[in-house]
Amino acid sequence: MMNSLRRRVTVSVIFGSSWVLALGCAAPASIESESEQTPAIATTPKGTTTTTAAEVPASTAVVTSVAPPSSTTTTSTVAGPPDDGVRSDERRLVELFSVTHSDLKPKSVVIGPGGLVFTQNMMYRHNILVFDGEGDVVAKIDDSVDLKDFGLSDESMQVAGAPVEAAVSPDGHHLWVSNYKMYGDQYRSDADDGCDRGDWEDSYVYRIDLERFEIDGVVPTGAVPKFLQVSPDGRRLVVANWCGFDVSVIDTETLTEIGRVDLGRHPRGVAITSDSSQAYVTVMGAERIDLIDLERLTVVSSLASSGITPRHIVLSSDDATLFSSNHLMDTVRMIDVKADTLIGTVRTGTQTRSLALADDEASLYVVNYLDGTVSKVKTTDMSLLQTIDVGGRPIGIAYDALTRRLWVADYDGRLIVFEDRAVSDN
């Protein structure tokens, strides 16, 4: 199929001191009250080019160390620390280092195969930056594509995206990236989170080959797609379309949207069950969490215990417990999904955003956007273990089980990296 045609797009990959640089476009927009400035007219994307390091000076990441490494810590590109039998809720977060870079404006951060770290940098940088476990840039993937190359236009149509969220396929071969909106002559110059259905154009998700760091697939979605998740069996991709008031369900093999499920105002978070048959989706504007059948594309039920403005959700490995950040309640909720009852709740900070669950599920990590803090919660009783002031606007978070490192995306242009250490190592 033409829309699954592999096409080399502009990628900046570092080999020693050499770079291959990509062109990008810049245009601002707003996100869930995170707006920085008034949207401007979008720049029409130009054709992709390849430039050598001699022609364009490289911009390098600046890594600032904070704490000395523990004796057991390595990057996840090699063997991780040994299993010492210490539960995550018996450890404490220690800040290791922070990373800044001229191309970094992270809305989200995701851990990939081999300890690679992916940051989605929206329309402010028009790229996905790839880091290794020590915060060095491995690649820069430009978000510009020609839709004709993917069978989505009869004529050449250069567009740029706005990478907002990402999900790694279970086999580790691909990264799926949602684009908040598209930029080009045929698109309006702005979009915002205070939308009604039909206010903005539909968008696309990209599939990226993680061996070549290439965009090798482009699939239509609804308007302003945000969070997305691949089913454990790898067959389906579920995308929450914020301004479409629905979710797209995509066949990952054929790269086609097989259908949409209408949910209501501002769907946001997604958590798919372990058998890949169903997905929980937060409907932030309707103050609801819906359960969707991924084969029939219907709503099975809604959780009454969802609370106000549920944003991000993570599901326990046994599918019994759902953790939800409730944005305007400043809390995290623990829900028994079978009984639809609230097990516990904890206030972590102002405007709770993204969540990450430790591999032993004994701890939950939370970013609090307006407070500029990161919280660690004990899941057995939903008590607060730590709150760490990181400043800025922490918005994305990811936990690397192999290294016990926690990566925090600061929307002001940083990554902050912690290690969850046994108390004796601190």
Residue ranges and their predicted role:
Residues M2-F15:
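Bacterial N-terminal signal peptides that target proteins for export
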Residues A26-A29, A40-P45, T49-T52, T60-V66, ...:
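Predominantly soluble domains enriched in secretory-pathway, periplasmic, or organellar proteins
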Residues M2-S4, A26-E32:
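N-terminal acidic, proline/glycine-rich, low-complexity intrinsically disordered segments
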Residues N3, E34-E36, K46, E55:
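Intrinsically disordered, low-complexity polyampholyte segments enriched for Lys and acidic residues
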Residues A22-G24:
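C-terminal motif of bacterial Sec signal peptides marking the signal peptidase cleavage site
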